[in-house]
Design a protein with these regions (language model features):
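Binding-site signature for planar aromatic cofactors or substrates
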Residues: 1-212
Length: 212
């Protein structure tokens, strides 16, 4: 399989310092709204990269479910591979690959778990089947087959029929507090625009242009 000839020149837009919002969260919201307006499939899908304490990396796609001045929120099973790694190494990276817009956003920071009340509020906003699924899925564990999941789902549906489904003790939210947020815009001849917000010592943000 030859991939050498797969290439595209990026021509849709540029990114100049004068066009940036002063706050990176506002800039992210602007780009996110443009991704929604362009009808990108699941614009809140992001790659989450974690690493074990000995430096072994892993990555997977998760969904952004909250954003404010404190950071970027997603939800998961605390006993999954990602959960085990985050418990030992809180440093993470997120990537939003908005390829159709020739854009991506790279976020690096530190993760903490969100308050139990916040996790419960989100959990109970989910479809009932998704709530049950959070109980069924022993994420990242080896199972004998799909029938194991389907049988467990039926048993839980019967157990909780007509009742509220409680929040699993091993499930909840994480918040990524960013230290850097880079906005990447593809440009002609691979001379891409890369503008990075970086936390300064006073807690504000510095903006730096990076070489492509």
């Amino acid at each position: 399989m030859s991939l050498a000839d797969l290439r595209k020149d990026y021509t849709l837009a540029g990114l100049a310092e004068k066009d940036l919002a002063r706050d990176p969260f506002r800039q992210f919201e602007k780009w996110f709204q443009e991704a929604e307006a362009a009808k990108l499939a699941e614009p809140n899908a992001m790659t989450l990269a974690t690493a074990s304490p000995d430096g072994r990396p892993s990555a997977r796609t998760v969904l952004l479910k909250g954003l404010d001045g404190r950071g970027f929120v997603f939800y998961s099973n605390y006993e999954s591979r990602k959960g085990r790694e985050l418990a030992l190494n809180a440093r993470v990276a997120l990537v939003f690959p908005w390829i159709a817009l020739e854009r991506q956003v790279l976020i690096e920071g530190t993760v903490t778990t969100v308050a139990r009340e916040e996790s419960a509020a989100y959990f109970h906003s989910r479809p009932r089947a998704s709530q049950l699924g959070a109980w069924v899925a022993q994420q990242s564990s080896v199972i004998p087959g799909r029938a194991t999941l389907e049988e467990a789902m039926k048993a839980l549906e019967k157990k909780h029929a007509g009742a509220e489904i409680p929040l699993p003790p091993n499930w909840g939210g994480y918040r990524v507090a960013p230290e850097t947020i880079e906005f990447w815009q593809g440009r002609r001849s691979r001379l891409h625009d890369r503008l990075r917000y970086r936390r300064d010592k006073e807690g504000g943000w510095l903006v730096e242009r990076l070489s492509p």
